[in-house]
Amino acid sequence: MFDETMRQPPDGEGSVQVEMDPALHIETAKVFAIYGKGGIGKSTTSSNLSAAFSKLGKRVVQIGCDPKHDSTFTLTKRLVPTVIDVLQAVHFHTEELRVEDFVYEGYNGVMCVEAGGPPAGTGCGGYVVGQTVKLLKEHHILEDADVVVFDVLGDVVCGGFATPLQHAERALVVAANDFDSIFAANRIAAAIQAKAKNYDVRLGGIIANRSVATDQIERFNARSGMRTLAHFPDLDVIRRSRLCKSTLFEMEPSPELAAVQQEYLRLAEALWEGVEPLTATPLIDREIFDLLGFD
């Protein structure tokens, strides 16, 4: 017979995710988890946000949670080895690892870590994220951090890739001003609300990205109770920064770039000061279609 703990999922309705080890709690830093539709620019957003925090004098750790391991590419100027790579190299004997084996200093002192992931179709990405946090704790990297940014794979919100939500105090959703990314943002918001029943994480809001206007996002916000925290337009300099292996703070100065840099600094300041948690009500799929899908 199942006991009571088996009958009552600890992590939201129907969840099978295990409860986080209390020893892995990130005590002192402000922790943010960045989600959004695949290809929407989460890594670019995360890296420039980390750079902005560092510009404010904060000690920042960015953790990439995607098997592509390109989250910190513009910060480090290269694809760094992943935690899963270095663990495999030492046959998972963590005592053989040094900090420099999996933590790399990037632009303006941002400490960069790529969790990586298991081979396609095998294992659980959440396990890899958990092992990454465990290693960082063992080597006291997180104790010295002011800010931790989790850059999370696509719009996957299964128990595994929702693992960063166990550590975060605010979850942010990157979305463009179009139906597909808003649809994904709504699903992500629903998953975050489910996690909020048992964890400290709360919705922070939407970061509008690659968008000239935000009218569709604002329509969604008005209906769901979400809000827009920042707006980054669809500029060629942002695309080129990725090709140049650079953050936006390293690109050739221009008036339009200066405006984007200031928006990142404003967002970092707002997040550091603390944004009020949202009590949004995600829409059902039909409501999204009715709201945005048929004009």
UniProtKB/Swiss-Prot annotation:
Keywords: 4Fe-4S, ATP-binding, Bacteriochlorophyll biosynthesis, Chlorophyll biosynthesis, Iron, Iron-sulfur, Magnesium, Metal-binding, Nucleotide-binding, Oxidoreductase, Photosynthesis. ATP binds at residues 39-44, 68, 209-210, 233-235. Its cofactor is [4Fe-4S] cluster. GO terms for biological process: light-independent bacteriochlorophyll biosynthetic process; photosynthesis, dark reaction. Binds 1 [4Fe-4S] cluster per dimer. SUPFAM superfamilies: P-loop containing nucleoside triphosphate hydrolases (SSF52540). Pathway: Porphyrin-containing compound metabolism; bacteriochlorophyll biosynthesis (light-independent). It holds the Pfam family Fer4_NifH. CDD domains: Bchl-like. InterPro entries: NifH/chlL_CS, NifH/frxC, P-loop_NTPase, Protochlorophyllide_ATP-bd. GO terms for molecular function: 4 iron, 4 sulfur cluster binding; ATP binding; metal ion binding; oxidoreductase activity, acting on iron-sulfur proteins as donors; oxidoreductase activity, acting on the CH-CH group of donors, iron-sulfur protein as acceptor. Belongs to the NifH/BchL/ChlL family. Homodimer. Protochlorophyllide reductase is composed of three subunits; BchL, BchN and BchB. This is Light-independent protochlorophyllide reductase iron-sulfur ATP-binding protein. It comes from Rhodospirillum rubrum (strain ATCC 11170 / ATH 1.1.1 / DSM 467 / LMG 4362 / NCIMB 8255 / S1).
